[in-house]
């Protein structure tokens, strides 16, 4: 089945060295995750608790979100509700516009990416500076993230070095990662000192305290919010957890699953506005309530955006993030894209081997592979099933329901072994594009059994 994904994957694989590096690097992250998880005896218990907590939270959103809002307001924060991406973007713009902000610093937020916040604000004349190193690199290169945790994983240090030569005046030909990191830090430091406002996403929102929690390894969220008096934070409504005790379960799982480290370098809790400042918090739906009403796919809301499913997925590792048409790639992106607009993102459904590795590593036990399988069953209902596959399946059904024809086909099948190669390996044989076809046995198992050759 030729899809946008398969064509983009073929382009990605043309650079064999880059493709191999991408595959190996992400597998190393998966291996680190395995080592760290084995050091925690109660790892599976934590996963079960995370899944149960998420299912509870998502089935009690009406209570927990209101509890969060009341506590956040009591803490001195302003709280807004956005039903979709347009409302979210306009709320952010109105806050910035009311304060006369023309440029601000922003930490990593997949919600902002989902709602295309940056292009919207830039169209209004507001400069957005990404403070996460990977996001900053991509911003300067005018590219989108290819991974939800490691956004620039597909970019080699030589490319970064050449970019910094143009944008920051670094030494020509110096591609040392430490040098490049220091150069980026020096460049960003100037942005941190005089921002008019700062914005963060949120990994978690705690209902019982009205606080948001942001996990970073670079400390960029803290740096960004340390100076300006105006802080904006936004999160998808599924990020809510009941209390700090529940939060502890997720912080133990998040970093181990995402990058194979015990905990992120910085776990920052934002509860109140700084003295003389303002804290504005936006709770976003943007289709999440629709997922909540879908019993087959409700577990998708369990996702904590750790990226473990991408690190382990053999298809993602070998095809790259840009081969997917939805802004989030990998197994979780396949499901989210189908929940968002199935007729637009259906081609991603084929980008899965159904090895179930994604389901096995998910810290919140999202049944990713099971859901992808369900989406495949729905392709025919959507009118998007592969026609050739349907014809072949129909032919197989016809033959399997007629023993005489089936046995005759088995008897004559070995003749194919002697056919010219071009008749077997052609455009109709997708399987043979990357594989050697197995030879047909001269004698079927059924015949051998009848003759007493096998017992």
Give residue spans per PLM region.
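The feature marks the mature, well-folded catalytic cores of soluble enzymes
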Residues: 1-296
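Intrinsic disorder at enzyme termini
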Residues: 1-26, 392-455
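Helix N-cap / loop-to-helix initiation motif
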Residues: 84, 309, 367-368
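Ferredoxin-type iron-sulfur electron-transfer modules in oxidoreductases and energy-metabolism complexes
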Residues: 266, 274-300, 316-425, 433
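Extended amphipathic alpha-helical segments enriched in small hydrophobics
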Residues: 306-310, 355
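Predominant activation on well-ordered alpha-helical scaffold segments within soluble catalytic domains
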Residues: 118, 245-248, 252, 307, ...
């Amino acid at each position: 089945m030729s899809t946008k994904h398969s064509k983009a994957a073929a382009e990605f694989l043309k650079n064999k060295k880059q493709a191999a590096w991408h595959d190996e690097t992400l597998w190393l992250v998966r291996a680190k995750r395995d080592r760290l998880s084995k050091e925690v005896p109660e790892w599976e218990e934590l996963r079960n608790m995370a899944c149960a907590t998420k299912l509870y939270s998502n089935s009690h959103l009406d209570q927990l979100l209101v509890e969060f809002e009341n506590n956040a307001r009591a803490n001195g924060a302003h709280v807004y509700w956005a039903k979709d991406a347009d409302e979210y973007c306009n709320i952010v713009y109105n806050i910035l516009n009311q304060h006369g902000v023309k440029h601000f610093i922003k930490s990593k937020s997949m919600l902002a990416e989902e709602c295309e916040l940056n292009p919207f604000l830039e169209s209004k004349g507001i400069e957005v500076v990404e403070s996460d190193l990977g996001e900053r690199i991509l911003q300067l290169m005018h590219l989108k993230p290819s991974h939800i945790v490691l956004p620039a994983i597909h970019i080699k240090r030589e490319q970064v070095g050449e970019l910094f030569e143009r944008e920051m005046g670094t030494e020509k030909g110096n591609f040392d990662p430490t040098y490049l990191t220091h150069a980026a830090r020096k460049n960003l430091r100037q942005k941190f000192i005089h921002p008019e406002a700062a914005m963060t996403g949120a990994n978690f929102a705690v209902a019982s305290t009205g606080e948001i929690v942001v996990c970073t390894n670079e400390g960029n969220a803290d740096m960004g919010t340390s100076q300006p008096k105006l802080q904006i934070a936004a999160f998808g409504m599924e990020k809510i957890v009941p209390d700090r005790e529940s939060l502890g379960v997720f912080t133990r799982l998040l970093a181990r699953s995402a990058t194979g480290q015990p905990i992120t370098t910085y776990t920052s809790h934002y509860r109140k506005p700084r003295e003389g400042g303002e804290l504005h918090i936006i709770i976003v739906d943007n289709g999440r309530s629709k997922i909540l009403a879908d019993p087959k796919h409700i577990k998708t809301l369990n996702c904590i955006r750790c990226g473990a499913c991408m690190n382990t997925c053999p298809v993602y590792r070998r095809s790259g993030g840009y081969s997917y048409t939805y802004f989030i790639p990998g197994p979780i992106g396949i499901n989210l894209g189908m929940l968002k607009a199935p007729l637009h993102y259906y081609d991603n459904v084929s980008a899965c081997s159904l090895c179930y590795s994604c389901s096995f590593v998910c810290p919140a036990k999202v049944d990713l592979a099971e859901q992808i399988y369900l989406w495949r069953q729905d392709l025919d209902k959507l009118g998007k099933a592969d026609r050739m596959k349907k014809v072949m399946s129909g032919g197989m059904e016809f033959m399997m329901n007629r023993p005489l024809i089936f046995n005759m086909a088995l008897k004559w099948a070995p003749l194919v072994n002697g056919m010219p190669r071009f008749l077997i390996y052609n455009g109709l044989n997708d399987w043979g594009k990357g594989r050697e076809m197995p030879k047909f046995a001269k004698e079927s198992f059924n015949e051998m059994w009848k003759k007493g050759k096998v017992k």
